[in-house]
């Protein structure tokens, strides 16, 4: 398994943590990451919940009704996780509401920076923003 096993030990005894680490290794997890509950919740908001927020917001556009024949890989890639179990994800979002609200604000700020550059016809700023995003993706995956 290439994926990581995330362990939030909290106040668990070391023996319990050791047992979970052994289990994760026996299952073939490639990496075992330790973190606090707060770090876990922040990273889940960023890595899992924000993509669902983005996909759902994206397909809520009236253009979604008309996309057939115009869309290809980009549409499919961004919208895939909008096929959501609404009951489950509403509970997950609300259980992590503070972290998700903060991450959503960050996403909106970044979208606004791109929107402003487009609206101002500011090619230099747009290239800088897009280049910065590409560099981050290349560096961090």
Regions found by a protein language model. Give the residues of each.
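Short, charge-rich amphipathic alpha-helical segments embedded
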Residues: 135-141
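Internal alpha-helical scaffold of NAD(P)-dependent oxidoreductase catalytic cores
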Residues: 2-81
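Interdomain hinge/lid region at the active-site interface
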Residues: 66-133
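A generic membrane alpha-helix/interface feature
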Residues: 46, 114-115, 140
